[in-house]
C-alpha cells in the first residue's frame, strides 16, 4: 500500500456540534418548533417577539450549512457550500442572525453552481475578517451536462479571480484538510469502492480545451467525531456516493461508529431511482443514530429513507438546527 492508502487523519473529538441549514431545497414554516427527540431538532420560529415577520426564509435548489463545533470553551464556525443564487444565502443568514465575523472557513464540496453560487457575497459579508476557502482545483473548471437528446449544456463556472480578496486564503487541495483546530476535516478526494455508486453518467468536464466524462473527483464532504457518539459525515451532493463517502470517512479516521449522516445523497432523477433501495440497504448496515437527507436526495428517496429508517430519519427544512 502507498502513503495515500494508509492515510489517517488526526481528527479531534468535539463535545458537541450544531448544524444549521442556511439553504436547502425545502422550506416549511408550519413544522413544529421541535421534534422528537426535541433536544436535537429545532426549527426557525414562525413568530419573533409575538409577531410573524413580513419576510421569509428562502429555499432554492442548493445547499449551505453552518457547522459549529464545541470543545471545552472553544467554539468554531464554518460553512459547507453557499447555495445557487447570490441572494438566498445572504438573505437567510441575515434572517437567522448568523454572525458572519465568526465564520472561519467556507468548504466548497464541488464545483457545481448550486454549491458555490453566493460564495463571493459571503466573503464580502465576512470582510474584513480573515477566512479560508477550502476547494479542490477541479472546482474552477468548466462543467457541462449531456442532455437526453444529445445536446450539451454548459454550467456556470466559479472564477477564481472573483474570490481573490485580501482577507481570503484559497486552499486548493485534493487531500483531507484540517479545520476548527482539528475538530473538522474536509475529506478530499473520496475513494470509490462500492460497485453501484457510479457518479453522474451525463456529466462532462473541460480539460485542455476538450470535454471528457466527469467523474467529479472534487466531490467531498466533512467529517467530525463527537465524544462518546461517533462520526458525523456531511455531504454536499455525494457524487462520489454517500456510502463511499461514509466508508472513506471511517477509513481515514479509524472510527467505525457513525452517529449522523447528513446532506445531499444525489438520488434524484430516473437514472438514480434504481439505486435508491440499494443505497438504503447499505445505510441500514451502517446504522447511524441520525440520518438527514437533503437537497439532491429527491422527494421520493427522502420518503423511502423515512419509511425504511423511521427512528433515525429527520426531516430537514431551511432554518432547522440539528444539535448533535
Where are these regions (language model features)?
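Pre-active-site segment of Zn-dependent metallo-hydrolases
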Residues: 54-61, 69-105, 248-252
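Metallo-beta-lactamase
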Residues: 138-220, 314-324
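Divalent metal-coordination and catalytic microenvironments
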Residues: 67, 81, 93, 110, ...
